[in-house]
Design a protein with these regions (language model features):
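Conserved donor-binding/catalytic core segment of Leloir-type glycosyltransferases
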Residues: 11, 210-228, 234-237, 250
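Short alpha-helical donor nucleotide-sugar binding micro-motif in glycosyltransferases
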Residues: 285, 293-298
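Conserved acidic donor-binding segment of nucleotide-sugar-dependent glycosyltransferases
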Residues: 285, 338, 342-349, 358-364
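Short hydrophobic beta-strand element within catalytic cores of glycosyltransferases
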Residues: 323-326
């Protein structure tokens, strides 16, 4: 174990982290860092696209506004400029393009005050780069996994080969749910130790509080992309309104990636086609406190996804004491119970509409205090920090003993 009173020094590497240019991107990573910073020194490296002066495309030029360094609370954050890393245009090459600049910064920071552990988020490009930094600087590496490895790594063999080569330099892979653990384990085939380290629910923001709820308001929070099946939810709303004509839907969604622009246009077209303009409000780019307040004021939160690795929205909704109507989409099935809402099959408009009506019918039977206490006890900041620090201590201590 580390000496009594000495805080671990953790280097976090994540391409996904909130910035002024993309304030909703990587909120889950920021929450993990904020929670860990209660008991460890957290330094975050966020590889950031280098953009030349006077670049004409605003969607890319916005990255020039990101500072080189800043401190948020207890966390230090560096934004080293790297070639590429603009959405998915250079995806297959992003690890190789970024390594030189990120390694140089990590080497300098390590020389000033040595790190005990590198914690990367996503195996690629983050984990691949972290593996090479760890081997160069003799620091153990772990990754948190927030996305499915298959079919992704099989469909992109250039990425898959880089991941395979990096595994020897990674001590632990930590998917965010048992559901994702199964997917990643099938690819790893026992080549690296694994454990589950879930996402954090920020219980200082997402908590139950007395509010006058709107019994006719449904809430969806998340990206508008095909995997989220927002189209199924919109069609289900149209079906619900046949018997409940005052029912409305609020969609709170950040325009995080230009790649999903066509998906957003299709959703807007569907709303117009079904004549639901007055029943659906789409709000872009709300911050977490605004999302939490919307959760506290709505009747139900709806999760319509085909697949979810964890589903922070489901956990946050329950932390706010708001029941769910949710598809059987994997990750949240580990913590959502019949006492928390209604589960239905994926890609079934009629089933989703029926689930909404069923949950509305027993809305007063749900116990908000019980929902909140169960979620916070498992995923709140203190609970998460207990899990993370035990993992950090174990990896750092074992590595020191072997070296």
């Amino acid at each position: 174990m580390r000496p009594v009173g000495r805080r671990l020094r953790i280097l976090v590497l994540s391409w996904n982290y909130p910035t002024g240019a993309a304030p909703q991107r990587g909120l889950w990573v920021q929450r993990m860092c904020d929670a860990a910073a209660q008991r460890a020194d957290i330094i975050v490296l966020v590889p950031t696209p280098w953009v030349p002066p006077l670049f004409p495309l605003k969607a890319v030029a916005r990255f020039r506004t990101i500072p080189q360094w800043e401190r948020r609370g207890r966390t230090e954050i560096y934004f080293p400029r790297v070639p590429g890393s603009i959405e998915y245009f250079t995806h297959d090459f992003d690890a190789r393009l970024a390594l030189r600049n990120v390694l140089a910064l990590a080497r300098r920071l390590h020389a000033e005050n040595s790190f005990d552990l590198i914690h990367a988020h996503f195996i690629y490009p983050d984990g691949v780069v972290a593996s090479q930094i760890g081997q160069a600087l003799n620091i153990p590496v772990m990754t948190s996994e927030h996305a499915f490895w298959t079919p992704w790594l099989n469909d992109r063999p250039r990425v898959g080969s880089q991941v395979d080569a990096a595994l020897n330099g990674i001590k632990l892979v930590a998917p965010v749910s048992p559901f994702l653990h199964q997917n990643v384990a099938a690819y790893l085939r026992d080549r690296v130790e694994m454990t589950v380290l879930p996402n954090v629910v920020d219980d200082s923001v997402f908590f139950a509080a007395p509010r006058e709820r709107d019994p006719n308001q449904l809430l969806y929070v998340g990206l508008i992309r095909r995997l989220k099946r927002v189209d199924v939810l919109i069609r289900a709303l149209a079906e619900v309104r046949r018997t409940h004509p005052t029912m409305r839907l609020k969609i709170m969604s950040a325009n995080a990636f230009r790649a999903y622009g066509q998906d957003r246009r299709e959703v807007h077209d569907l709303v117009r086609t079904l004549g639901l303009e007055s029943a659906i409000e789409i709000v872009a780019g709300s911050d977490p406190p605004a999302v939490a307040e919307a959760m506290r004021q709505c009747a139900l939160v709806v999760v319509s996804s085909a697949r979810e690795t964890f589903c922070s929205v489901a956990a946050e909704s329950l932390a706010c004491g708001t029941p769910l109507v949710m598809t059987r989409c994997g990750g949240p099935e580990d913590f959502v119970t019949p006492a928390d809402g209604v589960m239905v099959d994926v890609d079934n408009v009629h089933a989703l509409a029926g689930g909404i009506l069923e949950a509305l019918g027993k809305r007063d039977d749900f116990d908000a205090a019980d929902q909140q206490s169960r979620i916070v006890a498992r995923f709140g900041r203190e609970a998460w920090c207990d899990q993370a620090m035990a993992i950090y201590d174990r990896i750092a201590t074992a590595y020191r003993c072997r070296n």
